[in-house]
Design a protein with these regions (language model features):
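Flavin-dependent oxidoreductase catalytic cores
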Residues: 1-114, 118, 122-134, 142, ...
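Beta1-alpha1 glycine-rich phosphate/pyrophosphate-binding loop at the start
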Residues: 113-180
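A conserved short coil-to-beta-strand element within the FAD-binding core of flavoproteins
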Residues: 178-191
Length: 191
């Protein structure tokens, strides 16, 4: 809806806020720099990653967990009069129940996650953040599971943004990705 903010901005001297699918700090900067709006509002982007502004400020935009535009946990939930949430951030609405920091495992272990779909990648990320040595195996040649198929219809390609996020995170956490490799005894012996 940035084009609407830009149209309104040209009609008066009042402050204008751009809102809607502002996913990356570069996009927010461009809106302000090009005077399309005076401010930007982040809604769903902050549900997906509450640390969005802090990460942008410290130059860590690549680590921002992206909103994938599915509207299931946020907008759909509101329309159904249900508690809001976020498909890519399971902590939304439960922050008060969770520890302030991810606790390091007392005894780090070798962990194997079978399946490189979004759930498997999320599990691998959390295990690695807790200090475990993590390997992920999947019989498919690429990570993503059913998400790859779900992203094929027109207008759904940004579903892949969460896969790209996980792959970048897991690379930074030194997670051992074993794609095109089904689970078998030989694989278990090599870990």
């Amino acid at each position: 809806f940035v084009h609407l903010a830009e149209a309104v901005k040209g009609r008066g001297s009042f402050p204008v806020v751009a809102v809607g699918r502002i996913k990356r700090p570069e996009m927010a900067d461009e809106i302000i720099r090009d005077r399309k709006a005076d401010m930007v509002a982040l809604g769903r982007s902050l549900l997906a990653d509450p640390q969005w502004p802090a990460k942008a400020r410290r130059g860590a935009a690549r680590t921002i967990r992206p909103c994938i535009g599915c509207c299931l946990g946020c907008i759909h939930a509101v329309f159904q009069l249900e508690p809001g949430g976020c498909v890519v951030n399971p902590d939304v609405g439960r922050e008060y129940l969770l520890p302030a920091r991810i606790e390091t495992a007392v005894e780090p272990r070798k962990c194997l996650v079978v399946g490189a779909g979004p759930a498997g990648l999320a599990a691998a990320r959390m295990l690695a953040l807790r200090g475990h040595a993590v390997a992920v195996c999947d019989r498919q040649p690429q990570a993503g599971g059913a998400l790859r198929l779900a992203s094929k219809p027109p207008g759904r390609s940004e579903l892949m943004d969460i896969l790209n996020y996980f792959m970048e995170e897991l690379a930074g956490l030194n997670v051992d990705m074993r794609l095109n490799r089904a689970l078998d005894e030989e694989l278990l012996r090599t870990l």
